[in-house]
């Protein structure tokens, strides 16, 4: 319960990692607490799904930052930036979308069953 409380109290920073990390923590913490703060969790999932579209690049993937691909990965420069998709943003937002859809449960839209959370 404390982890769910903590995750819901923190405002989401909408970049690839923070977006997904928030949902990931809630998803795993609520496995045995399905009804705990359920409405707030559903609200958070919807908020994340709606915001993820701000990072979607038409005809491509997702940009890690709003209107900017990731410039550095840890200490290495990986691009000059720009409003384009990048592999890290696409991977993290795809995972975040899957988790958000799972958190919606019965409220998930039709077609969400095709989004899978695959553990490797």
Language-model segment annotations:
Residues 1-120:
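Terminal, non-catalytic domain-edge segments
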